[in-house]
Amino acid sequence: SLADFTYILYSEFLTIDPENSDWDNRDRVVLSVGHTCMLIYSILYLCGYLKIEDLKSFRKLGSLTPGHPEIETPGIDANTGPLGQGVGMGIGMALAEKASSNSASKRYTYILAGDGDLQEPIALGASTLAGHWQLSNLIMFYDKNDIQIAGKTSRVDSTDYGKLYESMGWHVQEIDGHNHNEIRLA
């Protein structure tokens, strides 16, 4: 579902400019599930940010396609690594954008998060603030696939994150992450 969501996001919703990856008026994307970075690199290649040679250099020292996203790569807005870090960073970016932009700004910050991200206290603390502040320029896609490094997340976590985020003041929509129409309407 992360692949479907990311494809729809980049192909139909993001305001970006591959020829000017530092453009101030672009939307931001934070891949909190940094270990899935090859997905983003593939999308960045299709959008014109990267070359096929960059993809062939995946995880090589000094390449534009390291094993976790780094801002040296055109189209990457945040370095991420530890789970949950990207959630906090994305919320901080959305807050900074809201505080510094004019009222006509329509820029969004998108966070792509997974099960392991939301289990981290750094993500939950930042999410509490985002809900309280009602950051209308922030959208987080939570890929609830019940998988983590040691097996199913349900073995160690029974939290209903939809209800938890609603209690923190977030607008929550549960969708089929493989259904492109549901993604578009969310």
Each PLM stretch: what is its role?
Residues 77-80, 130-157:
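A short, conserved beta-to-alpha structural element at the edge of catalytic cores
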